[in-house]
Amino acid sequence: MKTETLYQDPVWFQDLSVIFKRPSEIIPTRDQSDSERINAMVRLVLYCSFAVALIRQNYLYAILGLAIIAIISLAYALGAKKTKSNEAYGNIRPYSVKRSKKSCSKSSANNPFSNATVGALLDNEARPPACSYDDNDMASTMRKNFNKGLFRNLDDVYEVENSQRQFYTMPVTTAAPDLTAFGQFLYGSKGKTCKEDPSACTPAFATRDG
């Protein structure tokens, strides 16, 4: 399955057009780069301040929003300047790898961690891999299914006494492992190597969509 490679957005004061490219991204997430988080916060402040200014009929709220944006941007600029790397390969820019959405085997009461059990394979030999635990909704569903009918200690707020260490999603959750993907993970893809093309070593931020 092909993947889509997306370069990270510059911060808004370097390219103002990025604010309008993704108007719906207003909540910073861990999958975003630092500049993309700043852009998301700027959009959120803009929307809120101008909405309140229109409702209250008071332009001072818009000015307050612009002041907050200026403070956030200044803090980002000063922080970026302090943490500037002295890496010799300073021309290499990280990029985000956005994985294509695909079907997955969801958690169930009989198989909370979506493992390739004998029963699961008998039901569907061509079952897709288990859904990613990085998905907050899926992680919550797995925990609920695992804890269903389980005698729990009410004082165990960190969930350390219910055998979570022994039960987890296995690396391979299909009938057969994907040896091609594993080989590419170990030795790289069939494309150029770092020696042939330095851009092949560009650091990446992996973003999971499903």
From Swiss-Prot:
Disulphide bridges: C104-C131, C194-C201
One protein family per Pfam: P9_TM
Keyword Plastid attached: no
Alphabetical list of InterPro entries matching this protein: P9_TM
Record keywords, A-Z: Capsid protein, Disulfide bond, Late protein, Membrane, Transmembrane, Virion
Signal peptide stretch: none
Subcellular location: Virion membrane
Chief location of this protein within or outside the cell: virion
PTM annotation: Stabilized by 2 intramolecular disulfide bonds.
Annotated TM spans: 34-55, 60-80
Induction comment from the UniProt entry of this chain: Expressed in the late phase of the viral replicative cycle.
The keyword Disulfide bond is assigned to this record: yes
GO CC annotations, alphabetized: membrane; viral capsid; virion membrane
Subunit field text: Interacts with the major capsid protein.
Annotated function: One of the minor capsid proteins that constitute a network internal to the major capsid proteins and outside the lipid membrane. The minor capsid proteins glue and stabilize the capsomers.
Record text about domains: The transmembrane regions anchor the protein in the membrane of the underlying inner membrane.
The protein's name: Minor capsid protein P9
Annotated organism of origin: Paramecium bursaria Chlorella virus 1
Source taxonomy: Viruses, Varidnaviria, Bamfordvirae, Nucleocytoviricota, Megaviricetes
Gene: A407L
